[in-house]
């Protein structure tokens, strides 16, 4: 009986510790306007957290809105 109680308490403690983990957020959030009609044709490449190079930050925002994704800017420049 004592062994079962100790086992149960240990299992609960491990489950509690496992539930407290948080996901690490990678990259910088893109500066996206609330209304996005179109994007300028300026070439100022950004590397998304999906490993794809976008022509500019606006294009990344447009793709996020179009496909319902939340790709962030990993860095400025080509991937």
Curated annotation (Swiss-Prot):
Signal peptide (residue range): 1-23
Gene Ontology annotations for the cellular component aspect, listed alphabetically: extracellular region
Classification via SMART domains: KAZAL
Compartments (UniProt record): Secreted
Single GO molecular function: serine-type endopeptidase inhibitor activity
Disulfide bond among keywords: yes
Keywords assigned: Disulfide bond, Protease inhibitor, Secreted, Serine protease inhibitor, Signal
The protein's role, per its UniProt record: Serine protease inhibitor which exhibits anti-trypsin activity. In the pancreas, protects against trypsin-catalyzed premature activation of zymogens. In the male reproductive tract, binds to sperm heads where it modulates sperm capacitance by inhibiting calcium uptake and nitrogen oxide (NO) production.
This protein's name: Serine protease inhibitor Kazal-type 1-like
Organism of derivation: Rattus norvegicus (Rat)
Biological classification of the source: Eukaryota, Metazoa, Chordata, Craniata, Vertebrata
